[in-house]
Amino acid sequence: MTMITDSLAVVLQRRDWENPGVTQLNRLAAHPPFASWRNSEEARTDRPSQQLRSLNGEWRFAWFPAPEAVPESWLECDLPEADTVVVPSNWQMHGYDAPIYTNVTYPITVNPPFVPTENPTGCYSLTFNVDESWLQEGQTRIIFDGVNSAFHLWCNGRWVGYGQDSRLPSEFDLSAFLRAGENRLAVMVLRWSDGSYLEDQDMWRMSGIFRDVSLLHKPTTQISDFHVATRFNDDFSRAVLEAEVQMCGELRDYLRVTVSLWQGETQVASGTAPFGGEIIDERGSYADRVTLRLNVENPKLWSAEIPNLYRAVVELHTADGTLIEAEACDVGFREVRIENGLLLLNGKPLLIRGVNRHEHHPLHGQVMDEQTMVQDILLMKQNNFNAVRCSHYPNHPLWYTLCDRYGLYVVDEANIETHGMVPMNRLTDDPRWLPAMSERVTRMVQRDRNHPSVIIWSLGNESGHGANHDALYRWIKSVDPSRPVQYEGGGADTTATDIICPMYARVDEDQPFPAVPKWSIKKWLSLPGETRPLILCEYAHAMGNSLGGFAKYWQAFRQYPRLQGGFVWDWVDQSLIKYDENGNPWSAYGGDFGDTPNDRQFCMNGLVFADRTPHPALTEAKHQQQFFQFRLSGQTIEVTSEYLFRHSDNELLHWMVALDGKPLASGEVPLDVAPQGKQLIELPELPQPESAGQLWLTVRVVQPNATAWSEAGHISAWQQWRLAENLSVTLPSASHIIPQLTTSETDFCIELGNKRWQFNRQSGLLSQMWIGDEKQLLTPLRDQFTRAPLDNDIGVSEATRIDPNAWVERWKAAGHYQAEAALLQCTADTLADAVLITTAHAWQHQGKTLFISRKTYRIDGSGQMAITVDVEVASDTPHPARIGLTCQLAQVAERVNWLGLGPQENYPDRLTAACFDRWDVPLSDMYTPYVFPSENGLRCGTRELNYGSHQWRGDFQFNISRYSQQQLMETSHRHLLHAEEGTWLNIDGFHMGIGGDDSWSPSVSAEFQLSAGRYHYQLVWCQK
């Protein structure tokens, strides 16, 4: 029977979800994850606890447009319209309601603490049985690890409690509500609450019970909290494990706590004590707490490089040794501190190779499973990341355990963001919102502070700087002085942060925004009185085809010790799978669900696609972050290790000298490099090739044995140097055959054997080529000065909000996309050994000349067509995206072969990871399937390209695919692209960089812009 105080009407009348002073009702205090083992050996080995029962699985679910629409009868029994959904899940992924993607703008009308009357509500119910022994003794708790955004809980028709903060557990005592036989849970989840105003993160806005639900049975007298910390002497040869244990229940003199420390099967230390701590003040000590200190000689230290872990088992027992319960956690002996302007781990200055990670899955929304978490960690480790920022909320509890075990440094961030407020600190400077903010910070610390991987606490993200931040900064520093605190809001260098932690500050360029200037990172270090380390909390915005200029950051990080790295934005594209009318899956972004407001494709900023397939930019990050650096002097390779703690023990250095991709000599040397040490490797006398070509020395560091995070043969580092080559002159082969030139009113036609070339005299273009009777071109060869806009080219510009400073808008305004060619010259001459076609075009828009292109085509007796191009750029037109040629080839070949930089896509400001070699890949691999189509697939530094029956030689960049730049520009999603007839070839003499410092302002560095007034390039085109 539902009591009147438990009724739905009473709960609705209170409107707890619109009261910032009510963040919970009856929720239990925060603590580290518990399992309440009743066997200490099971606790030591982390076996499943019989006292912890998962409630994940099928629940009954009914959706309503508002909480007032929920019938009172639902508290007693399932509704006829109820469906079955899997918990954990987001209800939007089951077709209820729509996910909303927005970055800054709140998805609801801003009127804190009030939310819309139309407040989608999900009603979950589950019927379950409880073990009889659980009812007879002890306490049974229910734990919701994550519910978005707020919920009320009933058990057997009786109201239990209320919780909000979607990213931390809400735990309730069910003991008084359970009964023998069947029990029924009813959970009413509201999409919007006053807490939503603190959760304005750049992500999909989804709802539901999206993390695990479990029951935990603890004894009446129980461990209610425990906290472990490690202390060291100066040289880390001796350590102390401090374990503070708190109990609740009936305090008896015979109660004891034993803390034992294990390394595998070996007990390292152990201590036992009764409750009653040290005297705190004139009123005495805590009777329900005790601190034990265990001495450890020569501890094996924890780091991301060598994640040594011990296991601490905390036993609550009687004086005669009878175990009441045990809790346990992994322990990493490590020390984090800031000293002399440097962030130190175990006394060594860290270089943060970090990335921001949202919890996202293309099929499951914000539900994380262990397989996905492990996959993310393995990919991060394999690509030389050593740190992750939990952007922008505490993650699933398992994530931290995995980071402890595999080795990643973690910035644990409170679930606070008020980016859409004006000003941003409207709530964070308001004392009425301090309780809500406080719970989000303090409960995060209380849950996660036992994890060695957590090396920095973060007060949240993009919430301005308010007095509440200062208060919470001081709380953390008082409760946990063992870790620094960072917070970017208010300018990245306020009194609420131990680390200067800007986002998107540039290496050398100041961005003097009012009140919150972003100085260049080099300048920031030298500001008067500034002594803190600088670690970018976000940098290198990896949206679409991006990460240009990444190497510039890493040059600065290695040059300035107090520039200690940063966290790339971000790890994974947040696209979601939808299905078309035929059941085919496609990747969706903001607006594709009818969601308003929305920020389109801005949710896709990842180094990996949503399915965790790497973007090409990930390879650039891997290369720049590699832990081995190389220098070549003569025939000596100097290898420097940037590992702080790890001596190389699983690395071979492979070296190879190749001429135009053909190996001439190679060798292998085991690496034996101490942490932060060097090794000199003497190469033998290198061969001197007799023929012309590019001579390259390539070194690769290979791991011969598999590790916890990589397979055998994993390449962790590499470098290339171009070596000096012998000078040689290649004389053209004499041919007694001269191509035949035929002139008509419309065309110049050149014929040589079974090959023909046709130039249209009215357009001045190479209009067709034949090999025998087969046409080779579907479109003429013409100049190209534009590209399908990248996200970085578009910036924040969109149909309803034009940003005139965006590259794409500047190109459009100047007429680059609309320019048409006016023929200035088209002549043909027969030379002694060749036919020469000379053309000139003025590319014009609205009567204004933007470019003048002059070309010569020299077709000789060998059938080669040498093309020389000279381009003049108008001084008052924006720098073009590219200067090159394009055509649609008739052939569709299976593979592409080239001599140049590869194998992955590379651009002028993102090519340090690419290697010069001869590459051969399927045509499909030349296209990068960015969800939002754009320019893609470029390969730079090309000396030779072979495709079908064609060959091109010179010094150029190219991309080749089934999609034209026009189609890429006009198509909103990759699944809407259609393979066109033939193959589109773009050959560029010059291509602008792609940028990537951020994606909302022009970020291509000056040295990678096409700012010259004249350009010259050449290439040779022949048929095989």
Swiss-Prot record:
SMART domains given in the database record: Bgal_small_N (SM01038)
Site residues by UniProt (Transition state stabilizer): 358, 392
Active site: 462, 538
Alphabetized GO MF terms: beta-galactosidase activity; carbohydrate binding; magnesium ion binding
One Pfam assignment: Glyco_hydro_2_N
Binding site for substrate: 103, 202, 462, 538-541, 605, 1000
EC class: hydrolase
Keyword vocabulary terms for this entry: Glycosidase, Hydrolase, Magnesium, Metal-binding, Sodium
Residues annotated for Mg(2+) 1 binding in this entry: 417, 419, 462
Enzyme Commission number(s) of this protein: 3.2.1.23
Domain of life: Bacteria
Entry cofactors: Mg(2+); Na(+)
Reaction equations catalysed: Hydrolysis of terminal non-reducing beta-D-galactose residues in beta-D-galactosides
Gene Ontology biological process terms from the UniProt entry: lactose catabolic process
Residues that, per the record, bind Na(+): 202, 602, 605
Cofactor mode of binding and number, as noted: Binds 2 magnesium ions per monomer. Binds 1 sodium ion per monomer.
Homology family: Belongs to the glycosyl hydrolase 2 family.
Protein's UniProt name: Beta-galactosidase
Originating organism: Escherichia coli O9:H4 (strain HS)
Encoding gene per record: lacZ
